[in-house]
């Protein structure tokens, strides 16, 4: 016991002798996640990671998960604190307050808590807090103060302590536990055996964590007794140089065979090596949220996760970029750097700083022993003929060790270069002019300024023809030839894209102009500037602000405030962007200093940044991407897929996930996706497409979510991929789903519609058939009618023809009747002549008629007889022509006499009264009287036309 106290005192003295503060100039980047960021409890007690890369934290409010972009909380059913978590057997086992169980995905890919309390007897279900969970093989062990539980194949076994179980952990893949009265126990063959007796342990010994250490041993941290090394032979104190052992240690984790991290209750985090030497320390001063570390974890990419008393912090251990911003800099901006004669120098807005130089592989591990040797703005550091010079706001200085000697104070100096073919001639650009110096015997002698140029010369370069090229911010580019003292201004008239924003640099012994439209070169033959054909293939016509060649021949550049490198180490040039520094470099005063292939320094807004470019390229792990969430958007969003395809800790398929079928009215979707590349989230871009909707992949962008709304019925595959700044792409991950037809278009509806359509078609067919039949019948009737009409028309025409013929015949008969009537008239006249003759004879003086006269008379009488025969013939013809008119008339009116029948016949022939009078040998008056009498016999009203009456008989 005495030796233990001596050890503690020695450790305290060793610690007290250490220099407090930042030990090295370089500092790793720290990312802090505050409580308001992850929206859960304050404290985080344990940390785990699954094979997909997601992180899990035992949090005061539940199990907290993080995938690089999204946080999600899984509270326990009883809403209590989660003290412990352990990834085992493809499940995340969880220990809380009076709760024990595991998280595992359901069929929808969402994590669901499954309680294991039902496996315990009722008497064992009140166990308070589960502080530790460990597993070996299929055995899962849980520790509460009063019990140890072992889960194996769905069965739970309970182990009681002699008094209290203080700790549970693993030593060389064996389960150990600290029993308050018996000491450290080891689980062997189903039993707990004493491994380290209590009397061999320090007083008030309380283990807080254990981790693998050197081969066959482990490191133990305690709350009061410092650090210990545990082996099969026993336990002994362990000292870490630079660490006070007399403090509360909370956790220790092995990073690799050379590096370890150690968490404390009040002093932050230590990083130490296999030699037990502190390499780095991290506290609130270096950027942690607080110094109280509850848990530590090293993920698969060697990143360090810290569960703090308030929040979560993250350090990318293998990050190739470090901050160079010691407290001495006072957050001054970094403008230039140089290494000269075992000294490293920094030019900043706060002065010129010197640091003793050791040739290390990683210069960020140079000890923080900075000295400000010259206060005030320093623009440029450069070595001329093995002498270091500094261009400052108040003049040109020569630097030697920790001293700054004035060379010229006529003006502030931006830049200085030697002539390519005359190394002793130094060309300087100042605030007001270009001034020449002769470098001789380690001293600069002022030769004088160039009279043909006046103005600020911040950017200049020289070539082998003794030309000095100066770019002016708004005039163009000047060429000053020292041979003939000529000066010429080049503008857009001489090939430059503009007189604005031209910057001259010398790359690979060639003068180049970085412009708003790409890189331009000088064509000496044409005395013009032309776009460089070589750089056009790389940059195109994009704006370039800065160019610098490193020791390997790679070309660093700044484009739209973004830093990049033309990597020439491969078979063809490739561009590598450094997005981690976007917005952090010193815009307008960009500076890159390349010391060797492991150390490149970039001027920043606060200090500098160191990049190990070789490591930067090597650190790019194969990219993974997964779809973490698929939601159906609506009045209330519902999760369709929760991001887990299979068990929580198994390698999961990235393609053809899902195959969900979604109702038509739920046809708007929200997709979330992420690549759990924690150390380089700023380097990632994503591209997606929805097969069945998008024709092409989207442009690369930083978004990690995508919405699709009002999708039509059909099958869809959402695909997404990631790429980093090295243009490495991840495999494509995909999610399949189907938007079902609306209810009125589902299979049953379609079947019903088919049947209904068949019925409708049948009915339509019948209707059409009936319609066609009716139309056919109508057409037949119409044809028959037309035929009938045609027949009737034909009949009418025949009748008309017959009538016309009859009329013709009637006219002919009437003509004959008229002729007959005329003959009768003539004969009547003839009779009158006979009468006259007889009267004449009667008056003749001759008393007797001679035979000749008698014969003549007889002959006339014979003709009279013939006349009567002709009337009979006339009657017959008249009846034939006029439909037996006389017969019908005599039958209808038998009272009519012969002369009245004749009168009727003549009237029927529509003869005039005069003509009738002649035929009937009466006067016209007599005809009228006869007509009157005839009307009376026929009983014809006065208003009836006699001819019309007779015509209708």
Which sequence ranges carry the predicted segments?
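Short loop/turn segments that connect beta-strands within beta-propeller blades
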Residues: 67-70, 105-108, 152-155, 188-191, ...
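Residue-level detector of Asp-centered blade-edge/turn motifs that repeat once per structural unit
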Residues: 49-52, 87-90, 135-137, 170-172, ...
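Cytosolic signal-transmission helices at domain junctions
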Residues: 322-326, 759-832
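Residue-level "micro-hotspots" composed of small/polar
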Residues: 21-49, 76-82, 102-129, 163, ...
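Basic, Lys/Arg-enriched C-terminal extension of HTH/homeodomain DNA-binding domains
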Residues: 932, 936-953
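Loop/turn residues immediately N-terminal
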Residues: 60-64, 98-101, 146-149, 180-184, ...
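Helix-turn-helix DNA-binding segment
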Residues: 866, 872-930, 948-951
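Conserved beta-propeller blade signature
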Residues: 54-57, 91-94, 139-142, 175-177, ...
């Amino acid at each position: 016991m005495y030796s233990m106290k001596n050890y503690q005192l020695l450790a305290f003295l060793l610690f007290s002798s250490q220099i407090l503060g930042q030990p090295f100039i370089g500092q790793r980047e720290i990312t802090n996640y505050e409580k308001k960021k992850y929206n859960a409890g304050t404290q985080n007690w344990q940390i785990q990671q699954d094979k997909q890369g997601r992180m899990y934290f035992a949090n005061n409010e539940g199990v907290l998960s993080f995938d690089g972009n999204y946080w999600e909380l899984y509270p326990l059913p009883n809403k209590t604190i989660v003290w412990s978590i352990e990834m085992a057997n493809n499940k995340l086992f969880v220990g809380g307050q009076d709760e024990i169980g595991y998280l595992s995905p359901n069929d929808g890919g969402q994590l669901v808590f499954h309680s294991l309390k039902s496996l315990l007897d009722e008497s064992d279900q009140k166990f308070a807090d589960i502080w530790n969970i460990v597993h070996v093989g299929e055995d899962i062990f849980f520790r509460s103060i009063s019990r140890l539980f072992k889960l194996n194949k769905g069965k739970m076994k309970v182990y009681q302590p002699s008094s209290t179980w203080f700790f549970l952990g693993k030593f060389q893949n064996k389960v150990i536990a600290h029993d308050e009265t018996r000491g450290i126990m080891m689980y062997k063959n189903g039993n707990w055996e004493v491994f380290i007796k209590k009397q061999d342990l320090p007083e008030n010994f309380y283990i807080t964590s254990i981790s693998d250490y050197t081969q066959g041993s482990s490191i133990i941290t305690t709350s009061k007794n410092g650090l210990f090394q545990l082996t099969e032979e026993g336990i002994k104190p362990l000292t870490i140089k630079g660490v006070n052992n007399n403090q509360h240690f909370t956790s220790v984790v092995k990073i690799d065979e050379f590096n370890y991290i150690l968490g404390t209750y009040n002093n932050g985090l230590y990083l130490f090596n296999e030699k037990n030497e502190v390499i780095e320390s991290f506290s609130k001063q270096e950027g942690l949220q607080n110094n109280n570390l509850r848990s530590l974890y090293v993920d698969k990419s060697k990143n360090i996760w810290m569960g703090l008393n308030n929040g979560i912090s993250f350090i990318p251990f293998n990050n190739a970029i470090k901050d160079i911003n010691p407290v001495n800099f006072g957050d001054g901006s970094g403008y230039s750097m140089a290494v000269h004669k075992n000294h490293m120098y920094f030019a900043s807005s706060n002065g010129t700083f010197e640091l003793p130089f050791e040739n290390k592989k990683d210069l960020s591990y140079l000890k923080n022993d900075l000295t400000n040797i010259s206060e005030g703005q320093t623009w440029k550091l450069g070595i001329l003929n093995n002498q270091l010079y500094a261009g400052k706001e108040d003049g040109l200085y020569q630097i030697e060790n920790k001293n700054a000697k004035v060379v010229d104070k006529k003006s502030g100096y931006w830049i200085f270069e030697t002539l390519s073919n005359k190394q002793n001639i130094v060309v300087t650009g100042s605030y007001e002019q270009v001034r020449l110096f002769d470098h001789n015997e380690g001293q600069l002698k002022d030769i004088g300024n160039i009279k043909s140029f006046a103005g600020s010369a911040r950017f200049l370069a020289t070539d082998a023809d003794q030309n000095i090229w100066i770019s002016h911010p708004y005039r163009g580019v000047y060429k000053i030839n020292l041979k003939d003292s000529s000066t010429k201004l080049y503008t857009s008239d001489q090939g430059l894209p503009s007189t604005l924003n031209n910057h001259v640099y010398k790359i690979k012994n060639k003068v180049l102009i970085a412009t708003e439209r790409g890189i331009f070169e000088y064509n000496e033959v044409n005395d013009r500037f032309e776009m460089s054909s070589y750089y056009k293939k790389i940059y195109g016509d994009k704006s370039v602000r800065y160019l610098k060649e490193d020791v390997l021949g790679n070309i660093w550049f700044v484009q739209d405030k973004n830093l990049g490198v033309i990597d020439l180490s491969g078979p063809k040039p490739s561009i590598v962007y450094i997005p981690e520094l976007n917005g952090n470099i010193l815009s307008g005063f960009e500076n890159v200093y390349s010391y060797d292939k492991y150390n490149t320094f970039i001027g920043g807004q606060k200090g500098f940044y160191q990049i190990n470019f070789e490591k930067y390229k090597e650190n790019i792990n194969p990219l993974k991407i997964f779809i973490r969430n698929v939601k159906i958007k609506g009045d209330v969003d519902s999760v369709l897929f929760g991001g887990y395809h299979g068990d929580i800790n198994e390698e999961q398929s990235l393609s053809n996930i899902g195959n969900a079928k979604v109702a038509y009215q739920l046809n708007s979707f929200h997709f979330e996706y992420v690549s759990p590349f924690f150390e380089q989230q700023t380097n990632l871009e994503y591209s997606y497409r929805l097969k069945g909707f998008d024709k092409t992949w989207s442009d690369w962008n930083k978004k990690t979510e995508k919405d699709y709304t009002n999708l039509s019925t059909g099958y869809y595959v959402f695909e997404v991929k990631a790429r980093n700044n090295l243009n490495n792409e991840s495999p494509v991950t995909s999610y399949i789903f189907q938007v079902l037809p609306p209810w009125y278009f589902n299979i049953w509806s379609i079947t019903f519609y088919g049947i209904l359509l068949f019925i409708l078609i049948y009915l339509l067919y019948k209707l059409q058939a009936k319609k066609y039949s009716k139309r056919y019948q109508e057409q037949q009737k119409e044809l028959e009618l037309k035929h009938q009409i045609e027949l009737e028309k034909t009949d009418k025409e025949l009748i008309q023809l017959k009538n016309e013929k009859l009329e013709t015949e009637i006219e002919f008969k009437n003509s004959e009747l008229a002729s007959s009537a005329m003959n009768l008239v003539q004969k009547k006249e003839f009779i009158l002549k006979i009468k006259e003759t007889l009267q004449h004879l009667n008056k003749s003086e001759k008393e007797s008629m001679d035979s000749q006269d008698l014969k003549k008379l007889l002959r006339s009488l014979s003709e009279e007889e013939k006349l009567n025969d002709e009337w009979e013939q006339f009657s017959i013809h008249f009846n034939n022509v006029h439909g037996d008119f006389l017969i019908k008339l005599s039958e209808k009116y038998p009272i009519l006499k012969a002369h009245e029948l004749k009168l009727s016949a003549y009237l029927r022939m529509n003869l005039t009264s005069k003509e009738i009078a002649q035929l009937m040998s009466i006067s016209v008056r007599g005809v009228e009287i006869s007509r009157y009498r005839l009307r009376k016999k026929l009983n014809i009203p006065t208003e009836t036309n006699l001819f019309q009456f007779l015509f209708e008989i």
